């Protein structure tokens, strides 16, 4: 889904969602994609391999062919898409599942934010606190420009407090959420 706005889906991702017989993902992603989901498609709140694999097998037993699994953010940057892709590829490799697996990325959140802010990002340090730890203060001190992917509002508040405590309250922040 990329940044989560249906206007910003790639055509490929939009088609995959529209043609899917089953669409899986977190509740908010299913809601965001709802305008593109076929009326007769089944929606399932699932995005972890442990939940998806048994469900995919049950769908396949019923003859379901097209299944879309939704993720937000960038598919290649600390995304849950990686774990699901690896799990599905392993099932295919072991001969347990016959499937073609395609990752259809949305528009990159980094690219989108940088464009909206009028900033380049080829010289930026890219850091994620989305489900992981990072020493943002050290990065801000060391790097000329830092692009930071966060989990949400609570991360922003915590990072702001850390920067202020470190005497970095004068740094420029551009926030997209």
Give residue spans per PLM region.
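A short linear-motif detector with a strong N-terminal bias
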Residues: 1-4, 21-24, 104-107, 125-128, ...
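Class I S-adenosyl-L-methionine
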Residues: 1-102, 134
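Beta-strand/loop-alpha-helix module characteristic of Rossmann-like adenine-cofactor folds
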Residues: 100, 109-177
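Short glycine/serine/threonine-rich phosphate/pyrophosphate-binding segments
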Residues: 9-10, 76-81, 107-112, 156-158
């Amino acid at each position: 889904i990329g940044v989560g706005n249906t206007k910003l889906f790639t055509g490929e991702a939009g088609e995959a969602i529209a043609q899917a017989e089953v669409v899986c993902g977190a509740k908010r992603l299913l809601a965001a994609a709802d305008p593109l989901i076929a009326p007769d498609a089944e929606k399932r709140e699932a995005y972890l391999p442990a939940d998806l694999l048994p469900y995919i097998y049950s769908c396949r037993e019923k003859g379901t062919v097209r299944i879309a699994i939704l993720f937000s953010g960038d598919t290649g940057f600390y995304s849950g898409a990686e774990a699901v892709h690896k799990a599905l590829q392993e099932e295919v490799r072991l001969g347990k599942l016959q499937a073609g697996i395609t990752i259809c990325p949305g528009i990159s959140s980094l690219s989108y934010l940088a464009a909206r802010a009028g900033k380049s990002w080829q010289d930026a340090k890219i850091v994620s606190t989305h489900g992981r730890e990072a020493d943002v203060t050290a990065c801000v001190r060391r790097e000329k420009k830092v692009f930071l992917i966060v989990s949400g509002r609570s991360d922003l508040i915590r990072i702001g407090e850390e920067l202020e405590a470190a005497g970095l309250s004068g740094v420029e922040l551009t926030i997209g959420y």
